[in-house]
Swiss-Prot record:
Primary residence: plastid
Pfam families: Complex1_30kDa
Plastid keyword on record: yes
Role noted for this protein: NDH shuttles electrons from NAD(P)H:plastoquinone, via FMN and iron-sulfur (Fe-S) centers, to quinones in the photosynthetic chain and possibly in a chloroplast respiratory chain. The immediate electron acceptor for the enzyme in this species is believed to be plastoquinone. Couples the redox reaction to proton translocation, and thus conserves the redox energy in a proton gradient.
Protein name, as recorded: NAD(P)H-quinone oxidoreductase subunit J, chloroplastic
A GO BP annotation: cellular response to sulfate starvation
Entry's EC annotation: 7.1.1.-
Alphabetical keyword list: Chloroplast, Membrane, NAD, NADP, Plastid, Plastoquinone, Quinone, Thylakoid, Translocase, Transport
Top EC group: translocase
Swiss-Prot/TrEMBL catalytic activity: a plastoquinone + NADH + (n+1) H(+)(in) = a plastoquinol + NAD(+) + n H(+)(out); a plastoquinone + NADPH + (n+1) H(+)(in) = a plastoquinol + NADP(+) + n H(+)(out)
Listed GO CC annotations: chloroplast; chloroplast thylakoid membrane
PROSITE patterns in alphabetical order: COMPLEX1_30K (PS00542)
Cleavable signal peptide: none
Length: 158
């Protein structure tokens, strides 16, 4: 079953895959990494002007990584805002996804956190560097195949 946005994208020949609806009835779409930036711009122009959140997760050990975007279409005079969830999957061997920082500025810290925890590189992000872990940290802590070090260096804060 396709939602209204999926039908709208299909009429315009924009490649995507409908993943159905979540428990709140929000449509979920899968977009290929190479198509994500252009579709993000189209969605912004179409009215999805608010990025509610961006997160990422490891789908399975040795499998794909996913970057998830929750977008909201806010319009004056409309009581119920339209929402959509976009999932962009990438291979863990070279996890690269175009950054949408230049479309929605609120992805700045969120894409940095996804990079820091899962190692997804967001191409053309202006400040893509670790945000939670020290720069010297080796590995990506939220990957399912991550092996935690058996020691942690505690530094004196003074």
């Amino acid at each position: 079953m396709q939602g209204t946005l999926s039908v709208w994208l299909a009429k315009r020949g924009l490649v995507h895959r409908s993943l159905g609806f979540d428990y709140q009835g929000i449509e979920t779409l899968q977009i290929k990494p190479e198509d994500w930036h252009s579709i993000a711009v189209i969605l912004y122009v179409y009215g999805y002007n608010y990025l509610r959140s961006q997160c990422a997760y490891d789908v399975a050990p040795g499998g794909l990584l996913a970057s998830v975007y929750h977008l909201t279409r806010i319009e004056y005079g409309v009581n119920q805002a339209e929402e959509v969830c976009i999932k962009v999957f990438t291979h863990r061997s070279n996890p690269r996804i175009p950054s949408v920082f230049w479309v929605w500025k609120s992805t700045d810290f969120q894409e940095r956190e996804s990079y820091d925890m899962l190692g997804i590189t967001y191409d053309s992000h202006p400040r893509l560097k670790r945000i939670l872990m020290p720069e010297s940290w080796i590995g990506w802590p939220l990957r399912k195949d991550y092996i935690a070090p058996n020691f942690y260096e505690i530094q004196d804060a003074y």
